[in-house]
């Protein structure tokens, strides 16, 4: 079902009071946050934060240096809040399944911005995995991360 369909259709119950899931076309009101999912989110968040900090140290532009510094600080705060809220949903700690993270080392601004666009798409796709009703807190923090990225991309349009 397309995510933009009316909430009336999305909230309609089927036989046995079931809600739509990916398998039966409905979403559960009580989502299961698997350890694998949490571990993957942590890995992606750490990779992007490290990439931003690395580019921050490498750039020769003072404006980019300041913009990446602000992006890192804001994203770091929002990532921390995102993971803590996610952990609070089921009170289970993360056992990292993915023990290695990639150190993404963009060679130039174009490569760096391309990675930022990919990360933005990763964030927008979270709507597919989180329940809009049960996870509105997590998705609100995700929106804060998107705001950080979009503001940063605007700042990157300046010449100096």
Mark where each language-model region is:
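Helix-loop segments that flank and shape redox-cofactor active sites
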Residues: 47-70, 129-135
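Non-transmembrane amphipathic alpha-helical segments
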Residues: 52, 82, 123-126
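Extended, well-ordered alpha-helical scaffold segments
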Residues: 48, 53, 70-74, 78, ...
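Arg/Lys-rich, intrinsically disordered low-complexity tails that mediate electrostatic binding
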Residues: 1-34
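Acidic/histidine-rich alpha-helical segments that form the ligand environment
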Residues: 100-156
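Conserved alpha-helical segments that form or flank metal/cofactor-binding pockets of metalloenzymes
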Residues: 63-95
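Disorder-to-helix initiation segments
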Residues: 30-42, 48, 108-112
């Amino acid at each position: 079902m397309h995510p933009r369909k009316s909430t009336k259709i999305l909230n309609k119950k089927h036989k046995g009071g079931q809600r739509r899931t990916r398998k039966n076309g409905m979403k559960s009101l009580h989502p299961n946050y698997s350890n694998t999912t949490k571990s993957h989110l942590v890995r992606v968040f750490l990779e992007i934060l490290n990439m931003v900090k690395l580019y921050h140290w490498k750039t020769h532009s003072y404006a980019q240096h300041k913009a990446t510094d602000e992006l890192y600080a804001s994203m770091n705060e929002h990532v921390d809040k995102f993971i803590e809220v996610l952990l609070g949903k089921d009170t289970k700690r993360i056992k990292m399944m993915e023990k290695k993270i990639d150190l993404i080392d963009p060679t130039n601004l174009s490569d760096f911005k391309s990675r930022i666009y990919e990360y933005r798409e990763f964030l927008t796709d979270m709507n597919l995995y989180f329940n809009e009703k049960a996870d509105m807190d997590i998705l609100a923090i995700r929106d804060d991360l998107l705001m950080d990225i979009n503001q940063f991309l605007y700042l990157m349009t300046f010449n100096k």
